[in-house]
Amino acid sequence: MENKIIKFLAHNGKVLVKCIDSTKIVEDARKIHDLSPTATAALGRLLTMTSLMGSDLKEEEDSITVQIKGDGKLGILTAVTDSKGNVKGYVTNPRVDLPLNDIGKIDVGGAVGKNGMMYIIKDIGLKDPYVGMTPIVSGEIAEDFTEYFAKSEQTPSVVALGVLVDKNGVKTAGGYQISLMPDATEEEISKIEEAVKNSDSISKMLDDKLSLEEIAKKVTGDENIKVIDKNISPEYKCDCSRAVSYTHLRAHETRRHL
């Protein structure tokens, strides 16, 4: 089992697609932190998207920290990534487990909470780190990242994240981000909307053994996608204690308020 990130261009370069299979990352996190199924799904989604963001960093020492502070029982969720997409994370209450929601799915939104903030801290070698923040939209995490990209980075995107958990652990985990390039038109937007609507969930597509390239074709409606980066194999890497990570985050927050 290998974690993998592959990036594509679709619709003649007007659409950027980044796909990730993070199954091993999430399973490693589950084992290390003894996560409940609910915590596995929530932290797993956050780790998946944070890793995908890290893969865009330019310099080796760059990093991104994402923290979600909702009013749900899980407490605070934190993930940190480097420029290779390697990621680590933790949740305040890792054993919290909620009943399935009304549609029979793990209730990530209920566990994270629908009130609160998401913080993105990018440390890219400048005097001060960049700090972006947006209110939590649903607590389902993918929708919250979609809001962040639209509001803080002015990048219209579709974000999908999924973690499939069974009695043995993490069966599949992964995600994708579809971003419109500046020259994208209403035609490309309509094609993407239609393709995403007609696609299965990311966790089901991975469970059905679709490759990341097949997934990218499905969610863009473009059979002629172009691979632009396929040499990214991120891992779950825990290289510091939770206390050190909290100190690092507090330092960023202090500078943000100065």
Q: Where are each of the predicted segments found?
A:
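Interaction interfaces in information-processing and related assembly proteins
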Residues: M1-D229
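Local cysteine-cluster metal-coordination motifs and their immediate loop/turn environment
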Residues: P234-Y246
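Conserved small/polar residues in nucleotide/adenosyl-binding loops
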Residues: T247-T254
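Broad hydrophobic/π-residue packing in well-ordered secondary structure
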Residues: Y148-F149, Y236, H252
